[in-house]
């Protein structure tokens, strides 16, 4: 009612473009988050062994991020293995991790509102046969995708200069 002639305009594209540009302070927050996540990842991998549960591993990650100064989980953290990885959206459970399981880690740490995260697979045994072929295929596809995306971003950035 204060501005009866005001026009409401969507500015999603403007905000997305502005959010791509990070200040030195924002980059420092992201780096600190990644530093903490790296410590948490190392601790989870050290503790991973057959018989531990997915939730126990999440607990280790949570303990580490808080001990090292994170204000919260940046994104929901999870540790999935085998059957739990069949769904795009799942939850860590009291499922015990098995001897030859492939375990998916996704860990994050929020620093001053910035939420970097790292996701990676860990194999609990020797990766052989069809499983190795499948993982190799996925790595090649993802590597190609990421390299293509990076090239596109660089070209777009260069043309905007």
Describe every region a protein language model picked out:
Residues 1-161:
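Active-site neighborhoods and metal-handling regions in enzymes and metal-associated proteins
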